[in-house]
From Swiss-Prot:
Family: Belongs to the aconitase/IPM isomerase family. LeuC type 1 subfamily.
UniProt cross-references to NCBIfam families, sorted A to Z: leuC, PRK05478.1, PRK12466.1
Source organism of this protein record: Synechococcus sp. (strain WH7803)
Any Pfam family: Aconitase
Cofactor: [4Fe-4S] cluster
Family annotation (InterPro entries): 3-IsopropMal_deHydase_lsu, Acnase/IPM_dHydase_lsu_aba_1/3, Acoase/IPM_deHydtase_lsu_aba, Aconitase_4Fe-4S_BS, Aconitase_4Fe-4S_dom, IPM_dehydratase_rel_enz, IPMI_cat
Protein name: 3-isopropylmalate dehydratase large subunit
Name of the encoding gene: leuC
Cited HAMAP family: LeuC_type1
Cofactor annotation comment: Binds 1 [4Fe-4S] cluster per subunit.
Keywords for the protein's UniProt record, in alphabetical order: 4Fe-4S, Amino-acid biosynthesis, Branched-chain amino acid biosynthesis, Iron, Iron-sulfur, Leucine biosynthesis, Lyase, Metal-binding
């Protein structure tokens, strides 16, 4: 299978039938579910007298609504308690594996599936969550779906999809010290726009991509959706195989060798034809911070908020809206903007290497006066690994709060929220109005290392100036 793109190969391998109107019935190899988008789907199955078609291909966890301070049951929020209880009942009834609180395997769905070895090259992955594209880091084709589609996959293990075009995003050279995959993807979205990927899958390729760790590749693919793409992926290589080897659900013994041989064949061939290609130079990318109300409104930390005349006319109305909402002026330097809350975590940047990068900044320093800073590991496994390295102690000594795993302040579905006009430095993926729990709260997206720098200084600060320039 040397010719063609990985996307084409995986699509063809999972095609069940061509449907009227041009869509395809696609088999889903792995279905991930959680407590928010699954209750209505299970209820719809029961109404129709249906059962889960392939419970062995369905895996559940709880992440969105869980508190990160105390996870003792019952939760203080009765709605959150009912959502978790409903998930527990549904999984028990249908024979679905649930990685619940205290299991040692609970965490954000897009963190636990890779770390358990569930996500593998050549798979189709679906989940009722926008950032399912994360799993494309392994050479999988992964789609975020809505509740009605969660119902369809539970009932049939397949999904009606329209085939996408493929855009290759080729990145030359290497990222500089202090610059991470988060900066790269924010730069890509800034350059192409939040709608440029509509109708596309993004293939991330080139020397800079090959040099990324698996965890940074997950960050990259996680935010492909923020650029409008339906999914994003990286071709599987030795980095992929080394990450998967020995994980709980990965193939082992002779099956491992067969799997690796097949996985290698899935990578896009040298003669693969792409519908479009865009090139970037990693060496020119600086630590990047969003200044506005979409992930596409980003600038290098050494830049100023763009003036209207510098923008495409189509982008000026939302820029004007962003100036007012964020209380930032055209031409204002982003460095030096004061922050109130600093959040490190999420499915974008809540993995061990993210915490290591932030801890390298925090070590020997202290959170600035008046700043609330907290770290939320992406999973129980991440938390235990970080604690084994002493990272929790580093953060606590620096004045950060060390929390239990969950989605936390990425979104306003749990107790971790902004208040009033607070402004956060956040390692999450969305800076929409009200995203972090306050209707007037403001969000600046950046890498975990940059969040740590903001926490230490009380303002947006170029992490490269703190003499702790590291990448993983």
């Amino acid at each position: 299978m040397s010719s063609g793109t990985l996307y084409d190969k995986v699509w063809d391998l999972h095609r069940v039938a061509d449907l009227p109107g041009g869509s395809t019935q696609l088999f889903i190899g792995l279905h991930l579910i959680h407590e928010v988008t699954s209750p209505q789907a299970f209820a719809a199955l029961e109404d129709k007298g249906l059962t889960v078609r392939c419970p062995q291909r369905t895996v559940a966890t709880v992440d969105h609504i869980v508190p990160t301070t105390s996870q003792a049951r019952p939760f203080a929020d009765p709605l959150a308690e009912e959502m978790l209880s409903t998930l527990e009942r549904n999984c028990s009834h249908h024979g679905i594996t649930l990685h619940g609180l205290g299991s040692g395997r609970q965490g954000i769905v897009h963190v636990i599936a890779p770390e358990l070895g569930l996500t593998q090259p050549g798979m189709t992955v679906a989940c009722g969550d926008s950032h399912t594209s994360t799993h494309g880091a392994f050479g999988a084709i992964a789609f975020g779906i809505g509740t009605s589609q969660v119902r369809d996959v539970l009932a049939s293990q397949s999904l009606a999809m329209n085939k996408l075009k493929v855009r290759r995003i080729w990145v030359e050279n290497q990222l500089s010290p202090g610059v991470f995959a988060k900066d790269l993807i924010l730069h890509v979205i800034r350059s192409l726009g939040v709608k440029a990927g509509v109708g596309y899958a993004y293939e991330f390729s080139g020397p800079a991509i090959e040099a990324l760790s698996m965890e940074e590749r997950m960050t990259l693919c996680n935010m492909a959706i923020e650029g409008g793409a339906r999914c994003g992926y990286v071709n599987p290589d030795q980095t992929t195989f080394d990450y998967l080897h020995g994980r709980a659900q990965a193939p082992s013994a002779e099956a491992w060798d067969r799997a690796v041989s097949w996985w290698r064949s899935l990578a896009s061939g040298a003669d693969a034809c792409f519908d479009d290609e865009v090139r970037f130079d990693a060496a020119t990318i600086a630590p990047t911070v969003t200044w506005g109300i979409t992930p596409g409104q980003g600038i290098g930390v050494d830049e100023t908020v763009p003036r209207p005349e510098q923008l495409d006319p189509a982008d000026r109305p939302i820029a004007e809206e962003a100036y007012r909402y964020m209380d930032l002026a055209p031409g204002q330097a982003i460095a030096g903007v004061p922050v109130d809350v600093c959040f490190i975590g999420s499915c974008t940047n809540g993995r061990l290497s993210d915490l290591q990068a932030a801890a390298a900044v925090a070590k020997g320093r202290h959170v600035a006066s008046g700043i609330r800073a907290f770290v939320v590991p992406g999973s129980e496994q991440v938390a235990r690994a970080a604690e084994a390295e002493g990272l929790d102690a580093v953060f606590r000594e620096a004045g950060f709060e060390w929390r239990e795993p969950g989605c936390s302040m990425c979104l306003a579905m749990n107790p971790d929220r902004l208040e009033g006009r607070q402004i956060s430095a956040s390692s999450s993926n969305r800076n929409f109005k009200g995203r972090q729990g306050s209707a007037s709260g403001r969000t600046l997206l950046m890498s975990p290392a940059m969040v740590a720098a903001a926490a230490i200084t009380g303002q947006v600060r170029d992490v490269r100036q703190l003499n702790c320039m590291t990448t993983d």
